[in-house]
Swiss-Prot record:
It holds the Pfam family SPOUT_MTase. This is Ribosomal RNA large subunit methyltransferase H. GO terms for cellular component: cytoplasm. GO terms for molecular function: rRNA (pseudouridine-N3-)-methyltransferase activity.
Amino acid sequence: MIKIISVGTIKEKYFLQACEEYKKRLSRWVKVEEIEIKEEDENKYFNIETLLEKEADKILKHVKEGEFIIVCDINGIELSSEEFSEILRKNINSSKNITFIIGSSNGLSNEVKRRADLLLSFSKLTFPHQLFRVLLYEQIYRGLSIIYGTKYHK
């Protein structure tokens, strides 16, 4: 199973449709669970660290022992699609659930990052949250298409 935990919701219909399309395509190979965490109101907190700690509590209650945790972080390592697919393959073959965590525009707490088995960066560029979720779905689909030998990845 692949679980995607993200802080914030998708508001634009076209981003939502793209995610749903990739979820449908992925369903032939793997079950996908998506968990959206409500973004905290910045105005309620004295500092960002406190806000991130509150979001971390909400995120980590959905993380189970034994899952392979991939935290999406701009300071993580960058992988090729083939390298990414190899990480997916190893964990799928060992029957491990894979959990991806996407933070809010404020990022993620160090507590969440410490739980990661892999800190993964898609780029040094900054992406809108909604678009990034589509990119993540696409790369998961691409990775699995490499594993299962479909013609999607060229």
